Amino acid sequence: MSSDQEMAIFGEAAPYLRKSEKERIEAQNRPFDAKTSVFVAEPKESFVKGTIQSREGGKVTVKTDAGATLTVKEDQVFPMNPPKYDKIEDMAMMTHLHEPAVLYNLKERYAAWMIYTYSGLFCVTVNPYKWLPVYNPEVVTAYRGKKRQEAPPHIFSISDNAYQFMLTDRENQSILITGESGAGKTVNTKRVIQYFATIAVTGEKKKEEPGKMQGTLEDQIISANPLLEAFGNAKTVRNDNSSRFGKFIRIHFGTTGKLASADIETYLLEKSRVTFQLKAERSYHIFYQITSNRKPELIEMLLITTNPYDYPYVSQGEISVASIDDQEELIATDSAIDILGFTNDEKVSIYKLTGAVMHYGNLKFKQKQREEQAEPDGTEVADKAAYLQGLNSADLLKALCYPRVKVGNEFVTKGQTVEQVTNAVGALAKAVYDKMFLWMVARINQQLDTKQPRQYFIGVLDIAGFEIFDFNSLEQLCINFTNEKLQQFFNHHMFVLEQEEYKKEGIEWTFIDFGMDLAACIELIEKPMGIFSILEEECMFPKATDTSFKNKLYEQHLGKSSNFQKPKVVKGKAEAHFSLIHYAGVVDYNITGWLDKNKDPLNETVVGLYQKSSVKTLALLFSGAQTADAEAGGVKKGGKKKGSSFQTVSALFRENLNKLMTNLRSTHPHFVRCIIPNETKTPGAMEHELVLHQLRCNGVLEGIRICRKGFPSRILYADFKQRYKVLNASAIPEGQFIDSKKASEKLLASIDIDHTQYKFGHTKVFFKAGLLGLLEEMRDDKLAQIITRTQARCRGFLARVEYQKMVERRESIFCIQYNIRAFMNVKHWPWMKLFFRIKPLLKSAETEKEMATMKEEFQKTKDELAKSEAKRKELEEKMVSLLKEKNDLQLQVQSEAEGLADAEERCDQLIKTKIQLEAKIKEVTERAEDEEEINAELTAKKRKLEDECSELKKDIDDLELTLAKVEKEKHATENKVKNLTEEMAGLDETIAKLTKEKKALQEAHQQTLDDLQAEEDKVNTLTKAKTKLEQQVDDLEGSLEQEKKLRMDLERAKRKLEGDLKLAQESIMDIENEKQQLDEKLKKKEFEIGNLQSKIEDEQALGIQLQKKIKELQARIEELEEEIEAERASRAKAEKQRSDLSRELEEISERLEEAGGATSAQIEMNKKREAEFQKMRRDLEEATLQHEATAAALRKKHADSVAELGEQIDNLQRVKQKLEKEKSEMKMEIDDLASNVETVSKAKGNLEKMCRTLEDQVSELKSKEEEQQRLINDLTAQRGRLQTEAGEFSRQLDEKEALVSQLSRGKQAFTQQIEELKRQLEEEIKAKNALAHALQSSRHDCDLLREQYEEEQESKAELQRALSKANSEVAQWRTKYETDAIQRTEELEEAKKKLAQRLQAAEEHVEAVNAKCASLEKTKQRLQNEVEDLMLDVERTNAACAALDKKQRNFDKILAEWKQKYEETHAELEASQKEARSLGTELFKMKNAYEESLDQLETLKRENKNLQQEISDLTEQIAEGGKRIHELEKIKKQVEQEKSELQAALEEAEASLEHEEGKILRIQLELNQVKSEIDRKIAEKDEEIDQLKRNHVRVVETMQTMLDAEIRSRNDAIRIKKKMEGDLNEMEIQLNHANRMAAEALRNYRNTQGILKDTQLHLDDALRGQEDLKEQLAMVERRANLLQAEIEELRATLEQTERSRKIAEQELLDASERVQLLHTQNTSLINTKKKLETDISQLQGEMEDILQEARNAEEKAKKAITDAAMMAEELKKEQDTSAHLERMKKNLEQTVKDLQQRLDEAEQLALKGGKKQIQKLEARVRELEGEVESEQKRSAEAIKGLRKHERRVKELTYQTEEDRKNILRLQDLVDKLQAKVKSYKRQAEEAEEQSNTNLSKFRKLQHELEEAEERADIAESQVNKLRVKSREVHTKIISEE
């Protein structure tokens, strides 16, 4: 463990990587009992922490940390590790290793956001679902060069270890990042690439063309990810950024460890996502990035909108992802394209093709009238798509609707149905996108290939994770198979190879079987006769279906392989056909469409248009595709393409996967396991069972165990000796030879380590985990000691040298000092002075001579210097010019030398090519001669066949006579058959489904036992489901019949309304008129309310008792009123009561809002699911029960209110003592309340005076405790008295006819109360201030209660209307079960009246009360939105009903689906009804509160009368009272205005609701009509089908009599049966898909709120990610600036070079003239060479194609099963033969079609034997067609093929003679033989022509080669001359220098 200071280098990432030192100390000091602290198994959490309490009889009692006590077995208790192992970084170091220890270690680290943990030799990472600062640049720097044990676990550590291993071991490395989908593999892959691009940066740009390069190699490597993610990643159910393709990124390094280049291999892009997505998923990111409008110029260029919903291909699921900012991602993608060096044209092409794919989804086609042919439904979309692809829109539409098909010798247009065209468009869109993606990968690889020397690479693997969806198809099988192979690779590497290594090295080791072998599942998928093998085999048969594929799978594997199972049928889940047991779980697969996906066909006519597109990129994408036009033109290389084009998707996938596994096996792997912590993507949450499942599947525990038990580290003896000899050099004697193994043994024995931690093998020494790290530390310490000693020696030596210098300097100083002292002593001596004076004079004469001489020499030197300077300047100028000349000559010589070298190489290549071509010409010549012989043989055969055909013609004439008779006799029946065929074509699906079950049962006995069981299971399942649903319907009907007569009457009334729905418009107008005439409706509603109230009183006997109790309480209140004398105290209590009521009202309002939400949710569900109306059959009886429950709730509420009031009295008594403290709070409350009435300033002054008065009143409260108690009792009892108003209101409605509505009555009552209060306040001014606030509070409470009451009444009315509407819909589905029409009419009349009464009563409740304006506006808006949704749903329903007209038999299944939905919604209805009952209880509670508030007003009035005595004391407040009255009048007016506004808003909302009800009724009417129409059409279709069956039987009998074709009819039945089975499977899949979509929609609706919360979290993550991207963008911009500066420098250098070049050209004109001739000759030589190279490359291409096809033919010949296939393989050599055989095949097909028109399907099946021969000939023709170009080069093999062909012709002739016995077969074969004879004639003629042509070509090629030889000789001579001249120039330059 490192200290906090050492962790500081990691910056802000330190807390997320390792525990702090303080935390480690706390963990070590934490109390811990190793004997009692355990993990215990627990059902919910898997394992929990606990403490052992006792052990008895093999049982252990454990108390968990949560306080629960568990008693479990001994083996369910696991010991806990000491606290110091908490959050341990390497789980292999744990004391106790078991599942709970690993789980909790990961959980605790994850809770601390330490997402990386070592698990032995590999690393485990947990997806945090949030951004963490652990990938910053300082973290990268901190991990660089660190050993694994020196730094915390991290993906950077794994990457650095791989990098260091590559450098030290000189071995390729790979990093395998695996895990399930959504585990974080893609993010970790990007981090690995980021690390390598940072630490191995080259810092240099590649030398590319200007404008083509925008970044360094490391920038390009990093930028490849955003581009690939944009086009290859998408949102799935489990992952917002899921890689929908696999990629293996190889990063190549040079010898020094610097980046050299990189390349990317991709695997299996999920093409189907382009055109189809599930609801919770979306397509590839690029589509939504473009439509994000971040770059408006793209929107304009691509002719698209910014709304993805305008494009069906990309809007089938979700269109936005909270965690992804599509706008910013678009900028990153666009920048990546630029950085990766795409040209501007390529970039525009990428966007255009992407936009074209989006437009493809909008292409519409319709069926021509009276034809099945499809035609375009508008050309606007096609024009846009064609424009973007550089095509002609008319040609595109024509190619889609009328593709060209080759028939015989000609091309004909083929008609397409709408479905076929739609499928073709989808296939083209997927193909364009897939090919564009692969091209982008190839371009990226081309850009990343720097041509620098590279030695080793590190591969990073990122593939799609293991996927288990509700609907799993072929893509999921491929993905899961890849993960299975990788897991097997991991298991084999970790467990098998590791232990085999121990055995091989002779280490004592017991083999441990970890049970992790996945071979069974892998072999089941890929081995011969496995799933892929069977799939490819089925793709080879044209009539194969999904059903036949499934049957073969069952036959081959069901019951034979334990990993292959039959899926379980789960209600609500998509249909599955088989299940596989993978290592990560059981996956159910649906095989629908697998054959088409595997074959991946395309419209060849459209492909031909693509190849001619003006968009070069599109033409390039499809340049290698083979089309029909290309075949017609005889394009060369067509044979190769045709021979290799039929490669299935699964075969290509397996080939790529095998290459990947080969690459991985050749590297040293490093494993990173990614874990999903939870399914909800919640940060910090971990689901124990989910994580444990992944740990078990990934072999984490086993990997830790093998790491702990085994010896994961190993090193060769010689390397060990060399590296660790320094630990103890004395252990290895010097000067004598010693074996490396013995030296290693001695060395290890002499070191102080645990000797059980290593073993000696034959060639290596093996170490336990951690020991090698310990040795490294010891080595580092030893090296540190040695270096320290060396440094000490060096420092000592340097010090001694310095000391010696100091000694020498001191001796020199002593000598100088001695001489100076001696001089000082003698310098004043007289003789010395004389000596000083004379000595200079002695040399003066000589000095003068020397000076004169020196002056002369100086002058000469000066002159010479001037001359030399002038000369030097001349030489310098000349040197500069010569240097320029030299440089230019050097450049020229260098270019000439390079040109000479190139010319020499090309000459050598030409010579070699010449030799090769000569040999090839000889071979071709020989083959041409053989071809001539073959042609002669073919001519003889042709004559022989002509004789045979003449005989066959005679037979044909006889057959024609017979057929003419037959046709005359069946002419009458033929017309009937045609009519029936036309009708059955229109009803193809219906007839197929009706006859399918019968045919399936008839033919089931001819199937194997498994097929029989499968069919019976299907039939039984459907029958049981249908029976069960019918039984459920019967039970529901029985239960409804047992209900009360009232409910039956109401249901009959609703059934009657079905007939009346046709007059719905008139009823809606009547209802609207009634609403507009408010007075008339109010009177009616008052009468109906009286009826309802009387009914309620009859049904609620206990309610009467409650009213009696209310009256008693009222009498008691009257007695208490007389005793109230102290009103001043009542103010405080009233305020307290007000606050309590306010809180209660808030609670009620919250519940009302929740109830309103539930109500709106119920209405929304009713509108969105019209079928759910039938689920509400019991609604009205629940409404009646609701009244009974309301009565009981009232009784309970009364008792609760009494108890509550008692509790309030006690509370108030206790509160009394605290009134002094609460005085200030009351003052603030008074201020707040007054501020709501008038301005703050006026209210403040009044309330201050009132507060002073209240303070006086509070002082008096102490002496009036009893009076306060009575007052409290009075106030609390008022609620009981107000409850009596409920009964009184019903009577008041009859008594007060003058009242217009309940709202006006309340208004008048409030007005009277206000006026009375005004009079009382004028008379009683003293009491006014005390009561004014109480009055205001009471009125406010009344308003709130009234509003809540109104809301409850409105909610109740809405529920009643919704229930009535629902029941009316429910009744519609019951009409077909009613038989007694007359009785139903009478009952419906009575029930209609009752229902109208109840409807009017409900409307009266709505109109009688006010509602909050804001709430109604929101409700109105919400209802409008819901109605719009309902209209959309109705349109979809109508479409579904129209589809039902074509799918009569499917009606029962749809009915079962609706019944299932009925059960689900019925449960929801019950829940809603429970809520309605609770709301009813709350409703009565609100009514009582409202009445209590009114009673409080009356009580206050009486109290004001009692306070008249105090008027004299309050006279001084009269003026204030007047102001208060004025304020109250304003409040009154304001309240009245608000009431009028609310009433108007209510009326508008009510009108809106009634309008919506009218819409719903109209919809119901239309639905009922549609359903009745469906029933009628079903009956008609049944009759038509019966008639068709009878006619068909007669026709078949007639034809059997005339043609004796019973066998053919039986075969026809077999074919129809298979077709019916396929249709049945398709309909079952559609039904299951519909069920799944419905269930998914319901789940999405319920989970919306949770998703919104998750969205906020994702938004936060996205914001943080955006900040990261901004930082990265800034860094990229800085890099770009640096690159721009470098570019400018290069440009300056280039300009300078250009100027130098121009100067050199001027100075070297003479030299240019001499070299010009050489240039001219060289140029001509180069042109000649290029021409030769072109010719040779063409020849080489043709030779390579021929050789390749020869190898293919040899392989196919070995694999051939039948003689026909063998013959087909060997006849590929005959080009012309195959072309004419193709035309013959097409003619034969046309002939077959003509015969099919004259004969029915039975006759066609009778000719099945002939069709087999046709199929063989067709296969032979197709294969012959692919080998056209190889004819001339494989003549020897052609002879053998012709001989076999002769044998085959004899066999065919013999077969023909046998077929003559059968008239119909003979007719078909005769026609084919005629066509074949004609074809052979043309074939022989054209073969002769082709042979002559080829001979002429060969002679021409020989002549050209001779000329090439001459040119090569000339070139050689010219090269020699150039060499001589270059040497002369070079010698001249050297001599000049």
From Swiss-Prot:
<dbReference type="GO" id="GO:0005737">
    <property type="term" value="C:cytoplasm"/>
</dbReference>
<feature type="region of interest" description="Actin-binding">
    <location>
        <begin position="759"/>
        <end position="773"/>
    </location>
</feature>
<feature type="modified residue" description="Phosphothreonine">
    <location>
        <position position="64"/>
    </location>
</feature>
<feature type="region of interest" description="Actin-binding">
    <location>
        <begin position="657"/>
        <end position="679"/>
    </location>
</feature>
<feature type="modified residue" description="Phosphoserine">
    <location>
        <position position="1724"/>
    </location>
</feature>
<feature type="modified residue" description="Phosphoserine">
    <location>
        <position position="1472"/>
    </location>
</feature>
<feature type="domain" description="Myosin N-terminal SH3-like">
    <location>
        <begin position="33"/>
        <end position="82"/>
    </location>
</feature>
<feature type="modified residue" description="Phosphothreonine">
    <location>
        <position position="1253"/>
    </location>
</feature>
<feature type="modified residue" description="Phosphoserine">
    <location>
        <position position="1259"/>
    </location>
</feature>
<keyword id="KW-0963">Cytoplasm</keyword>
<dbReference type="InterPro" id="IPR000048">
    <property type="entry name" value="IQ_motif_EF-hand-BS"/>
</dbReference>
<feature type="modified residue" description="Phosphoserine">
    <location>
        <position position="1540"/>
    </location>
</feature>
<feature type="modified residue" description="Phosphoserine">
    <location>
        <position position="1235"/>
    </location>
</feature>
<feature type="modified residue" description="Phosphotyrosine">
    <location>
        <position position="1490"/>
    </location>
</feature>
<feature type="modified residue" description="Phosphothreonine">
    <location>
        <position position="1728"/>
    </location>
</feature>
<comment type="subunit">
    <text>Muscle myosin is a hexameric protein that consists of 2 heavy chain subunits (MHC), 2 alkali light chain subunits (MLC) and 2 regulatory light chain subunits (MLC-2). Interacts with GCSAM.</text>
</comment>
<feature type="region of interest" description="Disordered">
    <location>
        <begin position="1151"/>
        <end position="1170"/>
    </location>
</feature>
<dbReference type="InterPro" id="IPR027417">
    <property type="entry name" value="P-loop_NTPase"/>
</dbReference>
<keyword id="KW-0547">Nucleotide-binding</keyword>
<dbReference type="GO" id="GO:0016460">
    <property type="term" value="C:myosin II complex"/>
</dbReference>
<feature type="modified residue" description="N6,N6,N6-trimethyllysine">
    <location>
        <position position="130"/>
    </location>
</feature>
<dbReference type="InterPro" id="IPR001609">
    <property type="entry name" value="Myosin_head_motor_dom-like"/>
</dbReference>
<feature type="binding site">
    <location>
        <begin position="179"/>
        <end position="186"/>
    </location>
    <ligand>
        <name>ATP</name>
    </ligand>
</feature>
<feature type="modified residue" description="Phosphotyrosine">
    <location>
        <position position="1462"/>
    </location>
</feature>
<dbReference type="InterPro" id="IPR014751">
    <property type="entry name" value="XRCC4-like_C"/>
</dbReference>
<feature type="modified residue" description="Phosphothreonine">
    <location>
        <position position="1515"/>
    </location>
</feature>
<feature type="region of interest" description="Disordered">
    <location>
        <begin position="1883"/>
        <end position="1913"/>
    </location>
</feature>
<keyword id="KW-0488">Methylation</keyword>
<keyword id="KW-0597">Phosphoprotein</keyword>
<feature type="modified residue" description="Phosphoserine">
    <location>
        <position position="1572"/>
    </location>
</feature>
<feature type="modified residue" description="Phosphoserine">
    <location>
        <position position="623"/>
    </location>
</feature>
<keyword id="KW-0175">Coiled coil</keyword>
<feature type="modified residue" description="Phosphoserine">
    <location>
        <position position="1094"/>
    </location>
</feature>
<comment type="similarity">
    <text>Belongs to the TRAFAC class myosin-kinesin ATPase superfamily. Myosin family.</text>
</comment>
<feature type="domain" description="IQ">
    <location>
        <begin position="783"/>
        <end position="812"/>
    </location>
</feature>
<keyword id="KW-0112">Calmodulin-binding</keyword>
<feature type="modified residue" description="Phosphothreonine">
    <location>
        <position position="69"/>
    </location>
</feature>
<feature type="modified residue" description="Phosphothreonine">
    <location>
        <position position="1284"/>
    </location>
</feature>
<feature type="modified residue" description="Phosphoserine">
    <location>
        <position position="1304"/>
    </location>
</feature>
<dbReference type="GO" id="GO:0030016">
    <property type="term" value="C:myofibril"/>
</dbReference>
<dbReference type="Pfam" id="PF01576">
    <property type="entry name" value="Myosin_tail_1"/>
</dbReference>
<comment type="function">
    <text>Myosins are actin-based motor molecules with ATPase activity essential for muscle contraction.</text>
</comment>
